[in-house]
Amino acid sequence: MPRKGPAPKHPVVVDPVYGSPLVTALVNKVLLSGKKSVAERIVYGALEGAKNKTGNDPVVTLKRALDNVKPTLEVRSRRVGGATYQVPVEVRAGRSTTLALRWIVGYSRGRREKTMTERLMNELIDASNGLGASVKRREDTHKMAESNKAFAHYRW
């Protein structure tokens, strides 16, 4: 534990276009090599494309996608007497949002569409409809936690 205590939480910057801190977080997850304007162009293009394709408010689509991808349980490794157990633990709210954004961006990078804007747009639409690789990742995480429920008493 550091002597100075935990690092202070930074104030959440609200997105100038949509007025949502979730959009800012998504831009920061898409960001590569410090090229923020490129990341903003990708995210705004994806949100506009989602708006045109679904006809819904893009921030609502993003929130629905996040709700469908956010994990409630995950497994953590815990070493007990020479054996390593996968112990299911509940996920904090901030971490679940971060994981959901990370999974959405990661799986959109692996998609087959031509541009990152299209990939992110389609992954967001799929996730908001309960489909896609990022939703499957959440289901796999929950399944892993469910199958290791016997080790829940090792929780810390």
From Swiss-Prot:
Per the record, the GO terms for biological process are: translation
Supply the SUPFAM superfamilies for this chain. Answer: Ribosomal protein S7 (SSF47973)
Record bears the keyword Phosphoprotein? no
Gene Ontology molecular functions: rRNA binding; structural constituent of ribosome; tRNA binding
**What highest taxon heads this organism's lineage?**
Bacteria
Q: Does the keyword Disulfide bond apply?
A: no
Q: Name one Pfam family in it.
A: Ribosomal_S7
Q: Name one GO cellular component term.
A: small ribosomal subunit
Q: Which UniProt keywords apply?
A: Ribonucleoprotein, Ribosomal protein, RNA-binding, rRNA-binding, tRNA-binding
Q: Which family does it belong to?
A: Belongs to the universal ribosomal protein uS7 family.
Q: What does this protein do?
A: One of the primary rRNA binding proteins, it binds directly to 16S rRNA where it nucleates assembly of the head domain of the 30S subunit. Is located at the subunit interface close to the decoding center, probably blocks exit of the E-site tRNA.
The subunit structure is: Part of the 30S ribosomal subunit. Contacts proteins S9 and S11.
Q: What is this protein called?
A: Small ribosomal subunit protein uS7
**Which organism is the protein's source?**
Parafrankia sp. (strain EAN1pec)
**Species lineage, top-down?**
Bacteria, Bacillati, Actinomycetota, Actinomycetes, Frankiales
Identify the coding gene.
Answer: rpsG
